[in-house]
């Protein structure tokens, strides 16, 4: 029982840490204990170490940390990728030789394919880049329209020295602007973007399948071990078991069949992580947004909750809002909206207000007695806002996998 508890606690702690690192920064966890733990790990602990070092050691610890620390924390290094690959390789080297003589020919045919696919999709996810360069910048500028809600024209990247295309983001780790940037993945040492997002989804799917299949296969082998140690005809197996008896029985099995038992527990407790990440990205596809965009939409949701968002409901032909000024069009993109959304400090826009060209912020007139602009209504729900990048789940899915036919047909 002690061995089983120790293995379970170690794996559970590792899984919880990985879950927090992967999901803690997502908007849905922003005001939850998971988000708090993520901030503690990445913000409060480093700041606390820096504070203690400055007060007690005059900064000597961080100075000795020096270049190595900066490399680990701020550079696009392969250490996490090496760790991830090493865990996969070691787990398979422990599990497969022990399981191979005990499984049928059918499983012996399945296993090489199931373990090879994650490596292939990991490789193509790592080597496939979605960088925006001077050579493809003009094409990227036309790929997506600016929605004037979360992406505005006229913003330049101070590092790459060109206008930022819609849906792009500059990555401080890759030190490049990335087309349709979803997130920077430390497990890949690469940004997940336009060109490798579908490979990333295949990686998550293949990992989920491998871990689920491995968990089931390991359970089957451990059940065989249980039958050898405690035959089904044994009184212990025949009578109703209490939880302590049940756990002690399986602890004995894991202690006896350590290689299969340890790796099976690791697969069983980490499979939900891969599956949860896959489900989350399916949700993003359904919603027509990326991880980066979900954070921007979350900010809008907070602004709506605070009563700061307003929508133009008047005649667009009579509007002089810069948010209606035309920019470069994306001829290949079917989504379009002429909505005008603005943000205030909470008061409705007043007649004579101005709107920043590069944002939705309102500059109220200097006259405090200016009347309210009745052409604007307060936004009460996210349902009132159009997301031009959401073409419906099927078309979004086709776009992710590079099939633009559905999108073009949708536009026609």
From Swiss-Prot:
Per UniProt, which keywords does this protein have?
Acyltransferase, Endoplasmic reticulum, Lipoprotein, Membrane, Palmitate, Transferase, Transmembrane, Transmembrane helix
Q: Which residues lie on this side of the membrane: Lumenal?
A: 1-2, 100-107, 220-265
Q: Name one GO molecular function term.
A: protein-cysteine S-palmitoyltransferase activity
Top-level enzyme category:
transferase
A GO cellular component term found in this entry reads: endoplasmic reticulum
State its location(s). Endoplasmic reticulum membrane
Membrane topology is:
Multi-pass membrane protein
The UniProt family comment states: Belongs to the DHHC palmitoyltransferase family. SWF1 subfamily.
What this chain does, per the entry, is described as: Palmitoyltransferase that targets several endosomal SNAREs. Palmitoylates the SNAREs at cysteine residues close to the cytoplasmic end of their transmembrane domain. May have a role in the cellular quality control of transmembrane domain-containing proteins.
**Protein name according to UniProt:** Palmitoyltransferase swf1
Organism from which the protein derives: Emericella nidulans (strain FGSC A4 / ATCC 38163 / CBS 112.46 / NRRL 194 / M139) (Aspergillus nidulans)
Gene from which the chain derives: swf1
């Amino acid at each position: 029982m002690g061995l089983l508890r120790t293995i379970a606690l170690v794996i559970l702690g590792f899984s919880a840490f990985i879950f927090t690192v992967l999901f803690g920064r997502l908007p849905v966890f922003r005001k939850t204990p998971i988000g708090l733990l993520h901030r503690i790990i990445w913000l409060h602990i480093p700041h606390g170490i820096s504070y203690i070092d400055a007060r007690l050691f005059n900064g000597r610890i961080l100075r000795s940390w020096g270049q190595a620390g900066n490399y680990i924390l701020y550079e696009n290094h392969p250490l996490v990728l090496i760790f991830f690959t090493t865990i996969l390789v070691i787990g398979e080297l422990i599990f497969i030789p022990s399981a191979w003589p005990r499984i049928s020919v059918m499983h012996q045919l399945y296993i090489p394919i199931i373990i090879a696919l994650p490596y292939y999709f990991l490789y193509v996810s790592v080597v496939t880049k979605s960088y925006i360069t001077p050579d493809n910048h003009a094409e990227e500028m036309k790929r997506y329209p600016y929605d004037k809600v979360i992406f505005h024209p006229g913003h330049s990247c101070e590092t790459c020295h060109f206008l930022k295309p819609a849906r792009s983001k500059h990555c401080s780790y890759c030190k490049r602007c990335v087309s349709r940037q979803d997130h920077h993945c430390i497990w890949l040492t690469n940004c997940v973007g336009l060109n490798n997002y579908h490979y990333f989804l295949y990686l998550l799917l293949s990992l989920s399948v491998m871990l689920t299949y491995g968990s089931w296969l390991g359970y089957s082998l451990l059940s065989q071990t249980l039958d050898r140690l405690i035959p089904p005809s044994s009184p212990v197996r025949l009578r109703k078991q209490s939880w302590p008896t049940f756990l002690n029985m399986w602890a004995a099995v894991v202690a006896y069949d350590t290689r299969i038992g340890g790796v099976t527990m690791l697969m069983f407790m980490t499979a939900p992580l891969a599956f949860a990440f896959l489900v989350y990205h399916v949700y993003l596809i359904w919603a027509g947004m990326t991880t980066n965009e979900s954070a921007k939409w979350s900010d809008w949701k907070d602004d709506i909750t605070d009563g700061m968002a307003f929508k133009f409901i008047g005649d667009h032909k009579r509007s002089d809002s810069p948010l209606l000024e035309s920019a470069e069009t994306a001829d290949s993109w079917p989504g379009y909206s002429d909505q005008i959304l603005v943000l205030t400090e909470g008061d409705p826009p007043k007649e004579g207000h101005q709107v920043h060209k590069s944002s939705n912020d309102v500059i109220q007139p200097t006259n405090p007695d200016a009347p309210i602009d009745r052409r604007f209504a307060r936004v009460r729900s996210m349902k009132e806002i159009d997301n031009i990048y959401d073409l419906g789940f099927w078309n979004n899915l086709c776009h992710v996998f590079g099939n633009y036919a559905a999108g073009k047909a949708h536009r026609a």
